[in-house]
Each structure stands twice: as structure tokens, then as C-alpha cells.
Amino acid sequence: MSQYSFTSESVSEGHPDKIADQISDAILDSILAQDPRARVACETYVKTGIVIMGGEITTTAWVNMEEIARNTIRDIGYVHSDMGFDANSCVILSVINKQSSDIQYSIDHGNTSTLQRGAGDQGLMFGYATNETSVFMPAPITYAHRLIKRKSQVRKSGVLPWLGLDAKSQVTVAYEHGKIIGITAVVLSIQHACDIKLTDLKEAAMEEIIKPVLPNKWLTNNTIFLINPGGRFVIGGPISDCGLTGRKIIVDTYGGIGRHGGGSFSGKDPSKVDRSAAYGARYVAKNIVAAGLADRCELQVSYAIGVPHPISMSIETFGTEKISHDILMQLIKNFFDFRPYGLIAMLDLLRPIYKETAVYGHFGRECFPWEKIDKADLLRDAAGLKCTP
């Protein structure tokens, strides 16, 4: 298919599912700050006036989970009862147990070497990278995130103070022979104050959010802009919809272009391969593309509970590889450690860095260690390629 289009979406920090993700990761960070070896699996549910946190946590740390949840909600901006969700008055319930001793034993099972500890569960994870953007991410999800981040910036800075906290974006990108030829559609739905006219909202969103973010070279007279196509959007956030940790896994990753193994990230410490192996697979894919060994790369890795080494690993480069898959796989095995605690050591994951991941995507942002391209030169030299990508 020489011509095709692809659409991805993002959601704002005030979207109910993202509130839940941020609370879960805020709790994780607070625990890791005191106890880097803690085992954490924290899920959060939010609805009008209530937050419920549940999961399994084994740690020597003590944290005030209610205070963390309230501060997170407050930082997002839900601070008035007329919003239907208020950090100061919402009910917060916690149902937390310790991690199962069976799971703990299956991971540790008497190993004195940390690197030989097994995976905490079975599962499959994917990592993806492409050279179509400077951050080695697909363009649809990259610009969907940037629209939402820009929306947050203009609200917080007072440029558009009447914007609400809840919002969604959607960007459709057209391709020809695998190369971007334009943006065909942009959808932006933004919560707003009740006295704002839809015409004013559309004009402001176009001038202050869309135009500063989207490359002008990709916009044409045929590009469709749908700003609040449903009309009035005054009621939003948890009063409108319930939110749950891990329900925006495609927003969190590649917007649907790269495949997903099904496991969510937020609220999970890095001993969970759902999170750490997905980060590791992204690290590998990005370095392969940055090295010029392929234009696109997707890596799958799978694990069995209690087993330290991956059960399988496979690579897909969509016909863009510059060297064979056999050589690529050998390079991965030579330069990357996919044992669960090898990943933790390689990416320095036992740190409180996770709340920042809970909005605007886990990938394509240079502040995270799995986004480094520090092995690109090494891979290129080992592959015998002398040219730069």
C-alpha cells in the first residue's frame, strides 16, 4: 500500500485515567525514594468525590498514601468542590496487601546474585522506534502528545485560563511509501468554562495550541480541524467518567503503530518486566535506528515467572534493515542485558522517576534513561557500518 494514513490520540493530565496513573506512580516514587528495593504494584480508581487505591506492596518504607494522593490531585488542579472532584474533600480509601510470598520466592528463590533473580511474571513486551521524527517516535502520537502538553501550558500560564483540566487530542498523518506527506485531520476536545463561546474556543485553540505545535509544512487547505466537535464540554474529569490505572496503554506507548503486549506501566516497580522490559526494548530499538542499522525497528521480548533470561526475543524492521536480522539479534545479545535485574542496572531504574512518565507518554522524551542513544556508535561500529545515519 503506497498511500495510507494513521491516527493516534493523547489525553491530558486531568483526564480521569491519567489522574489514576499519576497517583499510582506518585506512590511508587515516594516508596522508591526510601526503599529502592521495594516491590510495588499500586492500582488507583477515581470517580466523583472518591479515590480507591489497591494493590500489593512489600517495603521497609513508610509513606502517607492519602497525603500523596491528595497532593497529586492538587497539583493536577482539582481543588474546588464545584469541579466534582476536589483534592481537599474527596474520600480516599486504601486496600493494600503485601506481595504474595509465592511470587517473591519465584523471583529470588535463594539466589545470592541479584542478576540471577527471575522475572516476577510471564508476559510479552514490545519496543519500537522510527526515524520519522527527531525523537525516534511515530509522528501521530508525538504530535498528539505535544498538542495536549501545549494545552496544559497555555492554561497554567494564564494565556487561556478558562480552559478546563480534561482534554483529548487526535492526529491523523498521511504517508506515501512510508514517508510523511501531511497531516490530514486534527481533533481536539477541551473542557472549558461555562461562559465561553464555542467560536472563541475554536479560534483560541487554533492560534494558541494547534499552530504553535504542528509543522506548517504538513498542513494543507485540505487538513480537517475538529475542535470540540461534540460542542459544549463543561462537565469533565472524574465527575464525567471514572478513571483507572493502566487504561491508556496505547497513549502511553506508540499510539498503536508499535504493537503492545498488554501490560500497563504505572504503579509498578521496575522488578515488573511489564514495565522494565518495555523500557529496555524501546532502548534497544531506538539505538538501532539511531545507529542507522534500520529506519524502523520493533523488538519483542517474553518472560516466564521465576526465570531470569528471556524465553524469546524477536526483531522486525519492516524491510528497512541495513544488516541482517541475525546480525542485529547477535548485537542485541552482545550489548544489552535483558535479565530483569540486568535491565534495572543498565537503565538505573531503582529511582523515583516514574510520576513524570504518567502523562504525555513514556517514550520520546529525553529526560528518561531508556531514551538515551549512548550505544548507537557502538552498534554501528560493531556492525561495520562507517556512515552516519
Swiss-Prot record:
EC id: 2.5.1.6
GO biological process: one-carbon metabolic process; S-adenosylmethionine biosynthetic process
Binding site for K(+): 43
Record-linked Gene3D superfamilies: 3.30.300.10
Known pathway: Amino-acid biosynthesis; S-adenosyl-L-methionine biosynthesis; S-adenosyl-L-methionine from L-methionine: step 1/1
Cofactor(s) this protein requires: Mg(2+); K(+)
Cofactor notes: Binds 2 divalent ions per subunit.
One GO CC term, this protein: cytoplasm
Chain positions recorded as Mg(2+) binding sites: 17
Keywords: ATP-binding, Cytoplasm, Magnesium, Metal-binding, Nucleotide-binding, One-carbon metabolism, Potassium, Transferase
Keyword check for Transferase: yes
Keyword Nucleotide-binding annotated: yes
Subunit structure: Homotetramer; dimer of dimers.
PANTHER family: S-ADENOSYLMETHIONINE SYNTHETASE
Homology family: Belongs to the AdoMet synthase family.
Name of the protein in question: S-adenosylmethionine synthase
Species of origin: Blochmanniella pennsylvanica (strain BPEN)
Gene behind the chain: metK
